[in-house]
From Swiss-Prot:
It comes from the Bacteria. GO terms for molecular function: ATP binding; GTP binding. The lineage of its organism: Bacteria, Thermotogati, Thermotogota, Thermotogae, Thermotogales. ATP binds at residues 9-16. It comes from Thermotoga neapolitana (strain ATCC 49049 / DSM 4359 / NBRC 107923 / NS-E). This is Nucleotide-binding protein CTN_0898. Belongs to the RapZ-like family.
């Protein structure tokens, strides 16, 4: 079965990294295709021996007068997977300062910050039609490749659920569909013999088992996520990200994320369990 992936999103959010990864996976990669030859390109691909093609679409308007229309055309012709990459304004400003490259919408009368916000508004309709929205603000290139690979692996195999623990003091994951706050639960950080351990350690698990409130919270999260994921699956959604946060991201959120992941696996879902801030102080 032929597979088409469209990589789009904000300039500076990681499209080059994503396209390089897809090329490594054997995709025929096409960047900055003129809109006038897009339809012909799709016809050639569908009739060729190529199995996988990735197309990068952005706001370079001399090539795509309407990026939304271009992606709708690709989707209609190929049932493509749409990957939308974004990052916070502050992170994009930092990246442009490092590379000293010019934003595609930047002009003499349009500064970088204004160009970033203008692009965000132009691409909002594409973000809303995307299969995957990946926020790369706090990601390394390796992490982006890992998440993109997981997304592609589940393209034809039903829905994938990402269970992500994090610490609120390190920032909220902006790509999460659900955020659950575990900061009201008892905190093993204040137990001297447990403070250096994590929510994956047996001693911490035994600590949490003393509190019925913890079990109740875990079950309530599972109930909500289980119902939501099943409905998302029926609607054709391919990935759902569930964020569970505590203060530092080492004890409460890690324990709960691990428990929820185990419960969802028993329901037959494809689950990716990540602990973003486990090694942070």
């Amino acid at each position: 079965m032929k597979r088409v992936v469209v990589v789009t999103g904000l300039s500076g959010a990681g499209k080059t990294t994503a396209m390089g990864f897809l090329e490594d996976l054997g995709y025929f990669c096409v960047d900055n295709v003129p809109g006038s030859i897009l339809e012909e390109l799709l016809k050639l691909f569908m009739s060729s021996d190529l199995e996988k093609m990735a197309i990068a679409v952005d706001v370079r308007s001399e090539h795509f007068s309407d990026p939304v229309e271009a992606i709708e055309k690709i989707k209609k012709k190929t049932n493509a997977l749409i990957v939308f990459l974004e990052a916070s304004k502050e992170e994009l400003l930092r990246r442009y300062a490092l590379t000293r490259r010019r934003h595609p919408l930047q002009r003499n009368d349009v500064g970088l910050e204004e160009a970033i916000e203008k692009e965000r508004q132009i691409l909002l309709p594409i973000k809303e039609m995307a299969d995957f929205v990946i926020d790369t603000t706090k990601m390394t290139s390796h992490q982006l490749r890992e998440i993109l690979g997981q997304s592609l692996m589940n393209q034809s195999g039903g829905i994938s659920v990402r269970i992500l623990s994090f610490g609120f003091k390190h920032g909220i994951p902006m790509d999460a569909d659900f955020i659950f706050d575990a900061r009201f639960l008892p905190n093993p950080h204040y137990v001297p013999e447990l403070s250096h351990k994590t929510g994956l350690d047996r001693e911490v698990e035994e600590y949490f088992k003393k509190y019925s409130l913890v079990d109740e919270f875990v079950y309530k999260i599972f109930e909500v996520v289980n119902v939501a994921v099943k409905e998302y699956q029926r609607s054709g959604r391919r990935i759902v990200t569930v964020g569970i946060g505590c203060t530092g991201g080492r004890h409460r959120s890690v324990y709960i994320a691990h428990k929820i992941a185990e419960m969802l696996k028993k329901e037959g879902f494809s689950v990716v369990e990540k602990h973003r801030d486990l090694e942070k102080v």
